[in-house]
């Protein structure tokens, strides 16, 4: 499984259209994703000012576009989706909440 941190508004739009298209896809050619373990750091870095954030749990085998694991400037490998993300590849959506100013994953998480 891979994950995608995004704001609730963009997720709602994606559900309406059946696909997620981000600015990064237009500008860099791919959609940024992460592992579950990397997701809290991603949320902290890019979504600290967002009120409503969700964590999409994605089944890679259901993603129609190519997924490449690439090394970022911090030395970690991240999954990048080279095309639109079809929403039927999203197998779970989790409200990503802050506790004491930090994003925290739920204690029980359906992550296969």
Question: Can you name each region flagged by the protein language model?
Answer:
Residues 1-112:
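Conserved, structured core segments of small domains
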């Amino acid at each position: 499984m891979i994950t995608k941190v995004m704001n609730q508004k963009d997720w709602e739009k994606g559900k309406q259209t059946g696909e997620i298209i981000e600015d990064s896809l237009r500008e860099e050619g791919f959609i940024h994703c992460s592992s579950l373990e990397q997701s809290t750091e991603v949320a902290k870095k890019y979504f600290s000012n967002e009120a409503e954030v969700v964590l999409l749990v994605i089944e890679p085998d259901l993603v129609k576009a190519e997924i490449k694991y690439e090394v970022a400037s911090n030395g970690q490998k991240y999954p990048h989706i080279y095309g639109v993300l079809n929403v039927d590849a999203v197998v779970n959506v989790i409200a990503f909440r802050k506790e004491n100013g930090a994003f925290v994953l739920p204690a029980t998480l359906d992550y296969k």
